[in-house]
Amino acid sequence: MGTFAVTGSASGMGNAVVQRLREQGHHVIGIDIKAADIVADLSTPAGRRGAGADVLAACAGRLDGAVLAAGLGPIPGAERVITEVNYFGVVELLQAWRPALAATDRAKVVVFASNSTTTVPAVPGRAIRALLAGDADKALRAYRMFGRYGPPVAYAASKIAVCRWVRHNAVTEQWAGAGIRLNALAPGAIMTPMLEEQLATPSEAKAVREFPVPIGGFGDAGQLADWVIFMLSDSADFLCGSLVFVDGGSDAYFRPDDWPRAVPARRLAAYLRRTRQFRSFERSRP
């Protein structure tokens, strides 16, 4: 059996993943702001450093996988906390845990993204670029023009940025070359305590209920956990740098023609250059 770290372990989708893993006999190290094996506030640099170090101590330097499920929704006035938890609370922990993941040679990582990555309009590219550059303050300045709509934009930007980080890093020697499979899962509206709170808030409930979901209703946290278990399994060895949507069809409804998309002619030279430069990381593995 393996050892797995799961953030957001105390409730919602993270807790459902913890239950599934423990049912299979795995050792799970849960991380959350309360009621967890490791209690940490991922909205602060100190909290993230502490969580990173505590997990490494608890796993004795070896992790078979990690699930980054901790996240905050579009809470009014919480742009900074959303940014810190949803982006830096993923990236900084994974950077800290990478040696432990590499030690097992076949580790799997699942990052919880969101279908907000493709269904929230007008997310400023400069905010995404700022996050990828590690500049939270610059990203926050980009949200000011949105006023009361700042939190949804901050939420979407944090999820887009973390997906970009996953896709850029998943195919590098440090990750793929170390045998680590790094992927992201993009849920839609899943019935969790966070969604229940939104549905109980009159100012938010109408928008949540009216948001287009072609198959109707809301997703089930247990079913999402089953997706995660698959992505952590040996069956997902060939899954690398992927973003998987599990959202009842919302992404397809809004953007049926946006992707897949062929490489445009203007990028052909760069495409051919990358093709010539490619070297498989398999040869560097034992």
Predicted regions and their residues:
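Hydrophobic positions on the long internal alpha-helix
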Residues: 51, 93-101, 165-166, 227, ...
